[in-house]
């Protein structure tokens, strides 16, 4: 099985989400959880933010857990100097690489960028640090210029990171870009995707198909602006759709997802597989097929996430599922009872917008029996 390296940036780009601020204990807890999950590389902060940030980064580095740790730095002397005191072994030196950003953000040009890449990559290596060269706004940059930047830095062999900073790539274009870079650069390549058009995960997968060896992710897709490629989606899709191993223990995904949700104060759409709805079935046709053979309606094995299929009753259930559910409660139904209870269940779900619980199902059955008894009594009196 082929492999891809996860470089998770929950503790850096994830925390850059508007309104998200992890405290030290939360950062350490997330760091421990990522290590338990088997994530090999982590961006743990921005040392130029100040001594408080650097102190937390040192505490994280001092845990002595597995995973290589990166500090995110602008491509400048101050940031590189600040990173040296944090205990990390690797720096992500980030440089705007599009003409638009070079001109309107830094008031610089391509020649300046090439010179700074050569100088600061060399300085970082001499300081004993490994380097990832972050190419900010690579999706809007001239691709030949990205190759020139990669060639300048190639002696130090930092993996260039292709950042779709404003999320304007689509999968076919991303595939072509990485094939282009792979043909011209004999280095590892990393992708950093944003979700402006809901394509961060798809673009990340396309980059891997084009030759990316490293991928940036965040837990739950947490991240600045439109967020990032979700660790969970990327790991599960690479494994199940492409047979690519990331070394991640997927059974730990629900727990770390919940941890980051609490720490960030951000809740995530119920559609996401690791939060269980993908394994919850109501529609009669689906339930019938699942009971006959689980793979009839199983694209993702819930065992990978420590989950199991859940069959619930609702508006779209059939009489067979009603009988099966009541059998689990120790109640055997006649056909007419199944049909009568199905009507009650559908009315309940329409009114309450949820599935009935076991106690409510028992109430429905009791009411049905009482109704039948009353009707029999009324008939006898007549």
Swiss-Prot record:
GO terms for biological process: biosynthetic process; carboxylic acid metabolic process; nitrogen fixation. Gene3D superfamilies: 1.10.238.260, Aldolase class I. Its EC number is 2.3.3.14. Pfam families: HCS_D2 (PF22617), HMGL-like (PF00682). It catalyses: acetyl-CoA + 2-oxoglutarate + H2O = (2R)-homocitrate + CoA + H(+). It comes from the Bacteria. Keywords: Nitrogen fixation, Transferase. PROSITE patterns: AIPM_HOMOCIT_SYNTH_1, AIPM_HOMOCIT_SYNTH_2, PYR_CT. It is an enzyme of class 2 (transferase). Residues 4-254 form the Pyruvate carboxyltransferase domain. One of its GO terms (molecular function) is homocitrate synthase activity. Belongs to the alpha-IPM synthase/homocitrate synthase family. This protein is a Fe-Mo-cofactor biosynthetic component. This is Homocitrate synthase. It comes from Azotobacter chroococcum mcd 1.
